[in-house]
Amino acid sequence: MSSWAITGASRGIGFEFAKQLSADGSNQVFALIRSEPSAELAELSSGRENLHVIQADVTDAQGLSEAAAKVGELTGNKLDVFISNACHPGLDLRFHPTSAFLGKEKELKEEIDACMNVNLLGAINSINCFLPLIRNGELKKIIYITSPSGDAEFTRKCGVTVTVGYSITKAAMNLVMSKYAAELKGEGIKTLSLSPGWVDTDGTRDMAPTPEILEMALQVFQKFKPDLTGLMSVEESVRMQLNVINGLTVKQSGLALSHHGDYNWL
């Protein structure tokens, strides 16, 4: 039996992790959500005794501690894998390039703060709260769901100028995961920043709400991967991500890798 906890599990990639992992009845799966569960998560959990839904807003340190305590009560105070998936895509000005914030310094701070509170500080606080359980687990893995947007080479090659707050907080958390790897290596704990690819989720559709914008995004990403044809299904992405997680080695700990297990971000 393996135990898994996933933040941001109400929909999208987080929900799919909970769905695929709980399909194996020998797994204990904890879907951590900010508020009320989505209809699909509520329906799924009602039919799976090994899937537990727990409220845990990653911006609320006290709530995270309470959620970790609830998980510990059900697992014997241990956890095998923690997946930090909750994220914030940015505010109304997320499609502004950096230089466009001249004269909009207040809006720039708001943009960065909104992303930082979830993507960086929220991730750190959630990992710290669940770390005592990971220390007692058998698999001892901490996974952060990152993005190609947090990679400098991807940004340079594709010419991505927007989503400033989202991108820099993802990049910052990639480094934090390397810090965790260095700190926890002696305890046998492995960490990984894992990019899911370009995935067909509500979040992606919000970022590209029209067919025209989606086509523009495809053309940008084809600069990195010329044979890219479109969005990947969330089911396929999570299957590939789980393969990377299950095969995570000590040598890979602290790296940022794609769903392919390499640096092919798309």
UniProtKB/Swiss-Prot annotation:
Q: Which GO annotations describe the biological process of this protein?
A: terpenoid biosynthetic process
Phenotype of the disruptant? Abolishes the production of arthripenoids but leads to the accumulation of a new compound that has a keto group at position C4.
Pathway this chain belongs to:
Secondary metabolite biosynthesis; terpenoid biosynthesis
The record's PANTHER family line, in alphabetical order, gives: CHAIN DEHYDROGENASE (ATSC), PUTATIVE-RELATED (PTHR45458:SF3), SHORT-CHAIN DEHYDROGENASE/REDUCTASE SDR (PTHR45458)
Q: Which SUPFAM superfamilies match?
A: NAD(P)-binding Rossmann-fold domains (SSF51735)
Q: Where is the signal peptide?
A: none
- Native organism is Arthrinium sp
**Swiss-Prot/TrEMBL keywords:** NADP, Oxidoreductase
Q: List the disulfide bonds.
A: none
* Record-listed NADP(+) binding positions: 13, 57, 85, 166, 170, 199, 201
Which family, according to UniProt? Belongs to the short-chain dehydrogenases/reductases (SDR) family.
* EC code: 1.1.1.-
GO MF annotations for this entry?
oxidoreductase activity, acting on the CH-OH group of donors, NAD or NADP as acceptor
Functional summary from the UniProt entry: Short-chain dehydrogenase/reductase; part of the gene cluster that mediates the biosynthesis of the meroterpenoids arthripenoids. The pathway begins with the HR-PKS atnH that catalyzes two chain-extension steps to form a reduced triketide, which then primes the SAT domain in the NR-PKS atnG to initiate three more cycles of extension to give a linear hexaketide corresponding to the polyketide part of arthripenoids.
Q: What is this protein called?
A: Short-chain dehydrogenase/reductase atnB
Q: Which residues form the active site?
A: 147, 166, 170
Q: What enzyme category does the UniProt record give? A: oxidoreductase
